[in-house]
Amino acid sequence: GSKIDTRAMEKIIKDVGLLDHRTKYPSQLSGGQRQRVALARTLMENKPIILLDEPFSSLDARTRLEMQDLVTSQFIGKTVLLVTHDPNEAVRLCHRIYIFDGQEIESTESLVGPFPKNINDNELHILQAKLLDQIRGNAL
């Protein structure tokens, strides 16, 4: 196998806020901590195409924002497919949003950066309302 870069691993563990928990067994970690371990593993792999399936779902609000910011900074120049049920998360983080309705795929307009969008930005709230209307099946 390939050699593990322990420096990079320690930095990523620190970045996801688990430095004090690195010697614990998985059963000793909370759901949110396990979620951050999975995120750290993805960050360590450093692949050009990344699938994130509900990566922030078990996190508290502050940690969620911190991890969203971390992911956005670490995945610059990579293709990321983010699966989420959170319209705010989609609008804050994504350049393009697809809505799945059964077997139908509906693409919304492309969004422009910078990313992640500021949670206090009025544009974020307008885009989120527009996305929610589309999810409900209302005309845009």
Short names for language-model regions:
Residues 77-84:
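Conserved H-loop
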Residues 50-54:
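Catalytic Walker B motif of ABC-type/P-loop ATPase nucleotide-binding domains
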Residues 64-76:
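Helical segment within the ABC ATPase nucleotide-binding domain
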Residues 102-131:
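Conserved beta-strand-loop-alpha-helix hinge in the C-terminal portion
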Residues 4-21:
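Conserved ABC ATPase "signature" region
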Residues 39:
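Hydrophobic anchor residue at the start of the ABC signature
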